[in-house]
Amino acid sequence: MRIGYGFDIHAFGSIKPLIIGGVQIPYNKGLIAHSNGDLLIHSLIDALLGATAMGDIGTFFPSEDKKYKNINSRILLKYIWKRIYLKNYRISNIDITIITETPKILSYIFLMRSNIASDLNIKIEKISVKSTSSKMIGCIGRKEGIACQSLVMLVKSKNTDRKNNII
């Protein structure tokens, strides 16, 4: 059993659409980022990489590399998961917390969970996505940005049959 933790935070200020968990959220500001700024996916990638001691998102996708400019972060997630999956790791569960004052995202959580389940080819029941506020404290409380934390538990599979990876 392996546990990984990921964290990401981005400031508002971009004209890009606001994307969280692969879902475009109607809002008047996007997040400043090299990629599409999907901080949920970024924190999840870091959690997966941490659980397997493979480094971090910047190791695989450096912000200096122009080929990752505005890239859909779900593509990056699928790439990382394939590498981890081929090492016979399977996801036991994922627990994600988004910290934001605004926008309110409760109505988008099921879509986020669905996107993650699809990208990782796992059952949606293995994925928890929650939202909380910072109680008006700090940069998030001042509505300057959004943060996200992800926890992942992986198990090593004894089954090398890769035909059915939904566990």
From Swiss-Prot:
Cofactor: how and how many bound: Binds 1 divalent metal cation per subunit.
One Pfam family linked to the record: YgbB
Cofactor(s) the record lists: a divalent metal cation
Feature type site, description Transition state stabilizer: H34, S133
Keywords: Isoprene biosynthesis, Lyase, Metal-binding
Positions contributing to 4-CDP-2-C-methyl-D-erythritol 2-phosphate binding: D8, I9, H10, H34, S35, D56, I57, G58, R142
Reactions this protein catalyses: 4-CDP-2-C-methyl-D-erythritol 2-phosphate = 2-C-methyl-D-erythritol 2,4-cyclic diphosphate + CMP
SUPFAM superfamilies: IpsF-like
CDD domains: MECDP_synthase
PROSITE patterns: ISPF
Record GO terms (molecular function): 2-C-methyl-D-erythritol 2,4-cyclodiphosphate synthase activity; metal ion binding
Pathway annotation: Isoprenoid biosynthesis; isopentenyl diphosphate biosynthesis via DXP pathway; isopentenyl diphosphate from 1-deoxy-D-xylulose 5-phosphate: step 4/6
GO BP term (any one): isopentenyl diphosphate biosynthetic process, methylerythritol 4-phosphate pathway
NCBIfam families, per the entry: ispF (TIGR00151)
HAMAP family (UniProt xref): IspF (MF_00107)
Family: Belongs to the IspF family.
Chain's role: Involved in the biosynthesis of isopentenyl diphosphate (IPP) and dimethylallyl diphosphate (DMAPP), two major building blocks of isoprenoid compounds. Catalyzes the conversion of 4-diphosphocytidyl-2-C-methyl-D-erythritol 2-phosphate (CDP-ME2P) to 2-C-methyl-D-erythritol 2,4-cyclodiphosphate (ME-CPP) with a corresponding release of cytidine 5-monophosphate (CMP).
Subunit structure: Homotrimer.
This protein's name: 2-C-methyl-D-erythritol 2,4-cyclodiphosphate synthase
Species of provenance: Buchnera aphidicola subsp. Schizaphis graminum (strain Sg)
Lineage: Bacteria, Pseudomonadati, Pseudomonadota, Gammaproteobacteria, Enterobacterales
